[in-house]
């Protein structure tokens, strides 16, 4: 199985709340990807952190270890899926989440997210949550 890591999963890792390195090792680094959108969101988060330089270095290290999937891969399905969701009154509130979900679908990747409810209306999207709550 191949995985697209949602931004919230990456943030859990960067904050030290998820042993993502170990999980990626188990799943196979070659099977784990991030979207260009996730890189944008991580950069924004780093620029708004208390220690900008440290946060940007952490993002650099993290991003350099994974293959980045371009959002252009979902261009063909974007209009079709957004129109479908609009017609049923279920447009996603977050356009970035929408693009991440479509990127997973277009590339036949399982989306790893802690926000499963945000993606329930996307047809054909496989979802996993690697966050274990006790």
Q: Over which residues does each language-model region extend?
A:
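Generic structural signal for small/hydrophobic residues in well-ordered secondary structure
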Residues: 6-7, 42, 78, 104, ...
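Non-catalytic, surface-exposed connector residues within folded enzymatic/regulatory domains
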Residues: 36, 53, 72, 93-94, ...
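Acidic, PIN/NYN-like endoribonuclease modules and their adjacent C-terminal/linker elements
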Residues: 1, 101, 105-134
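Active-site neighborhoods of divalent-metal-dependent phosphate/nucleic-acid chemistry enzymes
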Residues: 67-112
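Short, well-structured N-terminal submotif of metal-dependent ribonuclease cores
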Residues: 1-34, 46-65, 134
């Amino acid at each position: 199985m191949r995985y697209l890591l949602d931004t919230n999963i990456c943030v859990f890792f960067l904050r030290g709340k998820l042993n993502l390195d170990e999980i990626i090792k188990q799943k196979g680094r070659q099977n784990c990807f991030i979207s260009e959108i996730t890189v944008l969101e991580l950069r924004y988060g780093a620029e708004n952190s208390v220690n900008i330089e440290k946060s940007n270095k952490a993002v650099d290290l993290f991003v350099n270890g994974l293959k980045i999937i371009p959002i252009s891969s979902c261009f063909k399905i974007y209009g079709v899926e957004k129109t479908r969701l609009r017609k049923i009154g279920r447009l996603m509130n977050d356009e970035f989440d929408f693009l991440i979900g479509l990127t997973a679908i277009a590339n036949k990747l399982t989306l790893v997210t802690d926000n499963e409810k945000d993606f329930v209306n996307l047809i054909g999207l496989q979802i996993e949550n690697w966050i274990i709550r006790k």
